[in-house]
Amino acid sequence: MDFSLTNNQSFPDIGTLQVNVFSQNNYNPIPNATVIIQNTQTQESSVAEQLDTDSSGQTETISLKTPPLEYSLTPESSMPYGEYNITVSAPGYETTILTGAQILPDVKAIQDIRLVPLPGTEETLSQDIDIDPHTLYAEYPPKIPEAEIKTVADTGEIILSQVVIPEYIIVHDGLPDDNTAPNYYVTYKDYIKNVACSEIYATWPESSIYANILAIMSFTLNRVYTEW
């Protein structure tokens, strides 16, 4: 894949974006936060929009330039989405810089940003969030092979008698045998949404989106039920 194409391709179509800003501690909305959006695929990386959040912690929905719709519907095309950086700041919170937000044509992207409260000092802190290129566009290492039949260990925990949709999914941020990697608790709904956003494009036909999300849910629930 030739990533140099991204700096030269045209942006004839339009997608939309709304940013929601919350406190990481209690998920309360943060009003009057400043949101700056920059296009990463132009030479000057100029500011595309500067917005403020309302009393609900939301910006207005804005229009942003994107590549042609056909790119996301045709395999092996140029980058099918516009890449934007989002910087969010608010008094009393660390500034958050999100790099690589992906905006597709003809669909609305909703980006949640959770700001970290400052520790009570005047020190200026920031946190960086990098979004990797989409799995359908970039090249990634193949999935680690797994044994078709696995040994079931006696953990002493209760074994589910039927498939249950969990409230949270535990995400292991590392290789399966890396005990030093951290685990994160993610709500089931957010986990499915995040996986779907990484595996398919929102511009696909509705039937294709349904089929892929059902496959993602089936795989996830199988992992939970079998404790793999």
Region spans (language model):
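Beta-strand-rich domain onsets/edges
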Residues: 1-30, 45, 51
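Conserved, single-site charged/polar hotspot
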Residues: 8, 32, 52, 64, ...
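Hydrophobic beta-strand segments
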Residues: 33-40, 86
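A short, solvent-exposed loop/turn motif at the edges and junctions
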Residues: 71-99
